[in-house]
Amino acid sequence: MENETFGTELPDTWVGRIDGDNPEHALWYTTVSPLPEPDEVEEGVVTLGFASDEGNLRNHGTAGAALGPDAIRGVLGLVAVHDARPRYDAGTIRVGGDLERGHDELSDAVETIARAGHLPIVLGGGHEAGFGSHRGIYRARGSSPAIINLDAHLDLRAAERPTNGTPFRQVRELVGEEFRYSVLGVSVPNNTDFLFNAAREFGTEVTTDDEINAMSPQEAADHALALVRDAEHIHLTVDIDVLSEALAPGTGSPAAVGVELGRIRAICTGLAATGRLTLVDVVEVNPRLDHNNQTARVAARLIHEIAEAHLKAT
């Protein structure tokens, strides 16, 4: 595993164009900065790559999500920026076959970023990122943030080794009774009774894809906000397979139905606008399965809107 975090140069997958030197020409590509010393710069948002296929492979899935962080950066760089708040990139953790070490590196990086007052935005990579990132914020904050998981799957599997299906069972084992977990967009046919029983045992709030799709975007956002109304801090984790395969084909476990994008956008920006986000993951983007970077573009749009709303609120 090659650690490429907290360097003095940006990853070379940040690409774009330069239309001019004035702020009115700003793009992510022209505004994002490397982050060698997180505690010596103005507070902002920090993208951090977690290039991991190992969780998918252990779960008998398809490789390719390790390419997700670079694919997301490649399209996020072209997105226009309409504020002067700082955006940083802390590099990429490249996992290889040692997921446990990857989790350690991710937890350490997230803790460092959060202690310096920034919002970490983890780019995946498999959803195994959710455990490593949450453990890092748990250490930084001294408590476990409420988790909102936008996902077709409950991710509460029991397994001998961590996979992309076990992250939130691992979080439950870590934080115990502090565990506060809500999953929105669940596909009932893609989760066994064992998983639903685990969700009930752990007090998980479950909202299905059909239930979210029956709401307006504003109702969906209000529903998510109600779940964390009294939470001081929020961990928003977005598995791109919460969306329909027609919109997000580049993922290892695509959804036949999925949640309509407008509702996911409303939930993400509604949560970000509270100013209480403490951690964000956007995961399971697999460029090998994508069409013309379609899924990476959707992920980049969500990341941009989350960052913009959070920076405006803080």
Curated annotation (Swiss-Prot):
Organism, scientific name: Corynebacterium efficiens (strain DSM 44549 / YS-314 / AJ 12310 / JCM 11189 / NBRC 100395)
HAMAP family documented for this protein: Formimidoylglutam
Catalysed reaction, written as an equation: N-formimidoyl-L-glutamate + H2O = formamide + L-glutamate
Recorded superkingdom: Bacteria
Cited function: Catalyzes the conversion of N-formimidoyl-L-glutamate to L-glutamate and formamide.
Gene: hutG
Keywords, in A-Z order: Histidine metabolism, Hydrolase, Manganese, Metal-binding
Positions that bind Mn(2+) 2: D151, H153, D239, D241
GO biological process, one term: L-histidine catabolic process to glutamate and formate
SUPFAM superfamilies tied to this protein: Arginase/deacetylase
Entry protein name: Formimidoylglutamase
Cofactor binding: number and manner: Binds 2 manganese ions per subunit.
The protein's Enzyme Commission number: 3.5.3.8
